[in-house]
Amino acid sequence: MDLVTRRIRGALGIAGPLLFLEGVPRARLGEVVRIRGEPEAHGRAAEERSGQVIALSRDRIAVQVLEETRGLAPARAEVTLTGQVARLGVSRGMLGRVLDGLGRPADGLPPPVPEARPAIHGAALNVTRREKPSDFIETGVSAIDGMNTLVRGQKLPVFSCAGLPASRLAAQIVCQARVRGGEPFAVVFAAMGSPFREYHAFLDAFRAAGVLDRTVVFLNRAEDPPIERLMTPRCALTCAEHLAFAHGLHVLVVLTDVTSYCEALREVALAREEVPGRRGYPGYMYTDLATIFERAGRVRGRPGSLTQLPVLTMPDDDLTHPIPDLTGYITEGQIVLSRDLDRRGVYPPIDVLPSLSRLMGLGAGPGKTRDDHRPVADQLYAFYARGRDVRRMAAIVGAANLGEEEKRLLAFADAFEDELVGQGGTFRTIEDTLEAGWRLLSGFPPAALTRIPERLLRARPARPAAGAAALSGGAVA
């Protein structure tokens, strides 16, 4: 071993994407290494691969190779330890760029000129420097903006089931999201383990909506190495932190699919022969996910914010599966997609009853959205919950045997799903959402609107005479 360059010739062996070395006393966890095989035929130089130290045991190390290891002979491999951890060159010039999962250009353009090169394994925000999340990010989706408001600095995951249009919803939010008041806003989008069709569908959607110039795209493909999948969200967050806290932008980070990330984490852990935890996932998965999600927030004294909207697929539609279960402990609510609503053709199929934004009160209401936001949302939620109960009862006794009040609630539940939740791919402002909510509530007498203060009811314009009877006929006027 060369003590200056720390170059090692020869390796113990290879197991899948892992390269094992010995006689490396000064290696560091997370250190970047360069790997070169024997020269190819016709005198051509050997291809150089890169990797990262992921395990240490005395003077032995395990290196995760970022490229494939096929054709690499362990005995002839030459490994150079750089002494550096993984870093990413970041700048405001990354806006409008399409990058691979490691932050390298994937759009055929030169690399952005870096303003800084921070380590991608950044720490969570210092709790003593955190500012309370406030103000909302308008996604244009009524079930989120109206019922589960996304607040700047929040981490709000989307829980989906296999086959549901979670990717379509993620792309729609990237295209529609904005902040009020003309403040600078950007989106960082990171896809992990995306198949070919989905990979291009995202890019086509962003280009068609004309939002690529305010977006940084990180795309990790399904065929890329698992270690790259583990680095993709960290590269995206490193870029987002620079835009938010160095340039004062309000940044929304959309991560999809976190389940692909966790599968890669399990694959690497099994390759390292670690003792598995629940469902075969490593016991430190909670801590690992926390190092990603806890990078969201606001910093006291700085104008920007970093908001996260991670999307994950629940294996077997199981909300108690380790991935959604642990994610729910770290984050501040959840948006749940429903297979039943999707079967009925409702898009986006967001089930508002199990969905929750724990920080909604910090971004909705007087001075944030509208004075009537929380009361209207609470009243809609209450009627919809009762309507769902009536729907289950009607499946047993028959709709014809329901009373007038039950029929009105049943009609409201149907109209709520079709008119408010099922908006399709259109953009709705928060004003449009609240007015749609008021139209649904117009089918009830004022005395039934117990969640709405009297002053707000008096401030509303007179309702049409047909309004009180609108829901009794099963439709919303």
Curated annotation (Swiss-Prot):
<keyword id="KW-0375">Hydrogen ion transport</keyword>
<keyword id="KW-0066">ATP synthesis</keyword>
<dbReference type="InterPro" id="IPR055190">
    <property type="entry name" value="ATP-synt_VA_C"/>
</dbReference>
<keyword id="KW-0406">Ion transport</keyword>
<dbReference type="InterPro" id="IPR022879">
    <property type="entry name" value="V-ATPase_su_B/beta"/>
</dbReference>
<dbReference type="GO" id="GO:0005524">
    <property type="term" value="F:ATP binding"/>
</dbReference>
<keyword id="KW-0813">Transport</keyword>
<dbReference type="Pfam" id="PF00006">
    <property type="entry name" value="ATP-synt_ab"/>
</dbReference>
<protein>
    <recommendedName>
        <fullName>V-type ATP synthase beta chain</fullName>
    </recommendedName>
</protein>
<dbReference type="InterPro" id="IPR027417">
    <property type="entry name" value="P-loop_NTPase"/>
</dbReference>
<dbReference type="GO" id="GO:0046933">
    <property type="term" value="F:proton-transporting ATP synthase activity, rotational mechanism"/>
</dbReference>
<dbReference type="InterPro" id="IPR000194">
    <property type="entry name" value="ATPase_F1/V1/A1_a/bsu_nucl-bd"/>
</dbReference>
<dbReference type="InterPro" id="IPR004100">
    <property type="entry name" value="ATPase_F1/V1/A1_a/bsu_N"/>
</dbReference>
<comment type="similarity">
    <text>Belongs to the ATPase alpha/beta chains family.</text>
</comment>
<dbReference type="Pfam" id="PF22919">
    <property type="entry name" value="ATP-synt_VA_C"/>
</dbReference>
<dbReference type="GO" id="GO:0042777">
    <property type="term" value="P:proton motive force-driven plasma membrane ATP synthesis"/>
</dbReference>
<dbReference type="Pfam" id="PF02874">
    <property type="entry name" value="ATP-synt_ab_N"/>
</dbReference>
<dbReference type="InterPro" id="IPR020003">
    <property type="entry name" value="ATPase_a/bsu_AS"/>
</dbReference>
<comment type="function">
    <text>Produces ATP from ADP in the presence of a proton gradient across the membrane. The V-type beta chain is a regulatory subunit.</text>
</comment>
